[in-house]
């Protein structure tokens, strides 16, 4: 639809608004992680639009999609609004009459686009979800990610790193955020394209929440060897494989270059 409009309106400018989404799983909600997840989704979507030649900018919006839309309308004064949702049977936005409410409140024409991501196949670029904590900076994991990025015929590769927190308090979240920043910096030094967020203390919940937020080509889970890994004792790899609709890879790292716990 946007491609057709761009042919008609050469000066078409797009402002993309991504509302923050509350994860479905877990008893602990990290506000910064929710915003980080929305920011990564925004950057992915803008990259696709830019590759297609669109003049596009964006912002992370309120967790209420109606409020996020109205905030952007008030600031940007658009000529037209496009709202994309899942099919009616799967869309919470449609159950809350989002399209009709925005049209009535704004007085601006609203186009409704239905996107059935289950029918769209793999993501438009190669995206790996990486879940790790103590082994996130290990040589084994880094080399595996480099191999994926440089595989023969591989497209530009994005790695989304999730570092589960080690507890439910603010100090645990802050420590995980600091650890994540260090991991991302190390991977960028190796010329990898990365983004990341802190996850739920339960690694399975952290992984499932990330799969809710992102369409990925594969999941890469890094752990310590079986004799030292609580994640493996909890059967994390097989549990994720039962639910994920993409391949799940397991990287075992040595205990020599580790931080925190996995």
Please provide the spans of the model-predicted regions.
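Small/aliphatic-rich secondary-structure junction motif
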Residues: 1-29, 115, 123-174, 251-253
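A short acidic, amphipathic alpha-helical/loop segment
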Residues: 1-4, 71-72, 98, 143-144, ...
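A structural signal for isolated positions on well-ordered beta-strands in alpha/beta enzyme cores
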Residues: 13-15, 57, 80-82, 111, ...
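Short, surface-exposed alpha-helical segments at coil->helix boundaries
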Residues: 32-43, 96-99, 173-181, 234-237
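Short helix-loop-beta junction
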Residues: 44-54, 182-192
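Structural beta-alpha unit
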Residues: 52-80, 191-218, 258, 262
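Short, flexible loop segments at boundaries between secondary-structure elements
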Residues: 107-121, 245-262
């Amino acid at each position: 639809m946007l491609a057709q409009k761009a042919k008609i309106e050469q000066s078409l400018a797009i402002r993309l608004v991504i509302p923050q989404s509350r994860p479905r799983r877990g008893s602990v909600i990290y506000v910064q992680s929710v915003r980080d997840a929305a920011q990564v989704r925004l950057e992915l979507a803008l990259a696709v639009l830019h590759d297609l030649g669109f003049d596009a900018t964006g912002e992370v919006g309120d967790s209420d999609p109606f409020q996020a839309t109205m905030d952007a309308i008030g600031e940007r004064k658009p000529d037209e609004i496009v709202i994309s949702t899942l099919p009616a049977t799967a869309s919470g936005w449609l159950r809350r009459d989002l399209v009709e409410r925005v049209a009535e409140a704004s007085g601006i024409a609203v186009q409704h686009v239905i996107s059935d991501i289950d029918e769209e196949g793999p993501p438009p670029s190669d995206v790996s979800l990486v879940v790790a904590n103590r082994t996130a900076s290990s040589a084994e994991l880094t080399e595996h990610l480099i191999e994926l990025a440089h595989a023969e015929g591989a497209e530009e590769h994005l790695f989304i790193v999730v570092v589960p927190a080690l507890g439910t308090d603010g100090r645990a979240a802050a420590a995980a955020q600091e650890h994540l920043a260090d991991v991302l910096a190390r991977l960028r030094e190796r010329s990898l394209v990365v983004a990341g967020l802190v996850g739920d203390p339960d690694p399975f919940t952290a992984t499932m929440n990330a799969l809710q937020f992102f369409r990925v080509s594969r999941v890469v889970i890094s752990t310590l060897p079986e004799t030292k890994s609580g994640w493996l004792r909890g059967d994390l790899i097989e549990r994720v494989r039962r639910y994920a609709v993409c391949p799940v890879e397991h990287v075992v790292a040595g205990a020599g270059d580790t931080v925190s716990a996995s």
